[in-house]
Amino acid sequence: MAEQEPTAEQLAQIAAENEEDEHSVNYKPPAQKSIQEIQELDKDDESLRKYKEALLGRVAVSADPNVPNVVVTGLTLVCSSAPGPLELDLTGDLESFKKQSFVLKEGVEYRIKISFRVNREIVSGMKYIQHTYRKGVKIDKTDYMVGSYGPRAEEYEFLTPVEEAPKGMLARGSYSIKSRFTDDDKTDHLSWEWNLTIKKDWKD
């Protein structure tokens, strides 16, 4: 049986319903301080110095200035029932993702994992923003608060809450997703586009 494509009216209705779920928060970020400034504050207070060291680690602030402060390295769809890994290497050719598509079985539970590094300074209020399109119509916008992170050698990983893939005949098909990793200063650390195909089964 041929898949039934959603009409423009149905897509508009989905977009309107998702628009109602979006919430805006009046939040004013605090003034940004560098790692060096934080380390210099109350440096004669031994207990505070130890606390900051535990919080920030032994940070080397003389990192290569030519390397971006935040480097987003990968996106993974975490799904226990997937037959194989669903991963994007975000350090390579981002344009190639427009020609590929993840296959996700309808109705399964999954999470999105973003892997990233912070190289020099603390970054406040990082966010992962995702716009989802179907047949050129934006049907969903989701903002995930990632939080504030300081520099370290190891990668950080952020996991979104568990979500359920859409299901049903109208939900099956291709989706285009525009992703952006930003922060309180509205710095665009990385923007990329990728595709998702909802199918009745993993290998439909």
Swiss-Prot record:
Location within or outside the cell: Cytoplasm
Residue location of crosslink Glycyl lysine isopeptide (Lys-Gly) (interchain with G-Cter in SUMO1): 138, 141
Modified sites of kind N-acetylalanine: 2
Entries under Pfam families matching the protein: Rho_GDI
Positions of region (Disordered): 1-36
Chain positions found as N6-succinyllysine: 141
Any single GO BP term: regulation of synaptic vesicle cycle
Entries under InterPro entries matching the protein: Ig_E-set, Rho_GDI, RhoGDI_dom_sf
Phenotype when changing residue 199 to A: Loss of interaction with NGFR
Task performed by this protein: Controls Rho proteins homeostasis. Regulates the GDP/GTP exchange reaction of the Rho proteins by inhibiting the dissociation of GDP from them, and the subsequent binding of GTP to them. Retains Rho proteins such as CDC42, RAC1 and RHOA in an inactive cytosolic pool, regulating their stability and protecting them from degradation. Actively involved in the recycling and distribution of activated Rho GTPases in the cell, mediates extraction from membranes of both inactive and activated molecules due its exceptionally high affinity for prenylated forms.
Clinical note on disease: Nephrotic syndrome 8: A form of nephrotic syndrome, a renal disease clinically characterized by progressive renal failure, severe proteinuria, hypoalbuminemia, hyperlipidemia and edema. Kidney biopsies show diffuse mesangial sclerosis, with small glomeruli, hypercellularity, increased extracellular matrix, and contracted/collapsed glomerular tufts surrounded by immature or abnormal podocytes.
Name of this chain's protein: Rho GDP-dissociation inhibitor 1
